[in-house]
Every structure is written in structure tokens, then in C-alpha cells.
Amino acid sequence: TKAAQDENDVVPGLESAARFVNLAGLAKVPGKNLELVAVLNGPATSAALGDDAYLKRHQRTNPNRKLIAALNEAGVDVMVCGQALAHKGFSTTEVANDVTVAVAALTVLAKYQSAGYALIPN
């Protein structure tokens, strides 16, 4: 996933997921018919960090936290790639409680696509 162009902005992939949820609502798609998973990896990995860890590394609170909480409330499962966490030197204990740590983004994508989910890249 791409990182935000400005460190004060949210990750574009999370914005896309929120847009999808909002458009589905406008189209009157029942929430029970939506099953969305957002996977953070690569440059967007730090978006998964809790505020304390993000503050320690970026000297500011995480601008993605409110959107991740809203996505969770809408039923979106927000995940982060465990391989990307390790590569970037982040501990799984630094990840926010409402973000699931996956073994790898590649395995998540393969699993969900084989189950019929559509990949919507950002």
C-alpha cells in the first residue's frame, strides 16, 4: 500500500476502503452483505501503529487512527503485514489493538482472493 504523501494525511488505501463503504451505503447495500479486508504493507505499514509507537517514531500522533476505528466500526477487518512490520523494525506489540497482524500480506491476498474476494488496489 502507498504511504500518504504528507505525514499529516491518512494512507490512501484506507481512504479508498472508506470510500467503498460509503458508496455501498449510498447504493443501499446492506452492511451484512459487505465483507471488506484492508491490508497495510510496504510504505503504509506504520499506519498500523498505535499512537504511542507512532509518536515515538514520527513525533506526532497517528493520523490514521480515527479512520481505522471507523472502518472497524463499519465491519472492515484492518490488517498489517507481519513481514513488513519486521522489515521496518516494528514490534507486533506496537500495533494498535484494532489492527490484526497477518503473517504476510501475500498470504492474506491469496487466501481472500481464492475465497472470492475482489482485489481493489490503490
Provide a role label for each language-model segment.
Residues 31-48:
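Acidic helix-start/capping segments at beta-turn-to-alpha-helix junctions
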Residues 1-2, 39-43, 82-84, 122:
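Active-site-proximal beta-strand/loop segments in catalytic clefts of secreted hydrolases
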Residues 10, 49-51, 91:
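Short, solvent-exposed loop/turn and secondary-structure capping segments
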Residues 24-28, 47, 52, 78:
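Amphipathic alpha-helical interaction segments
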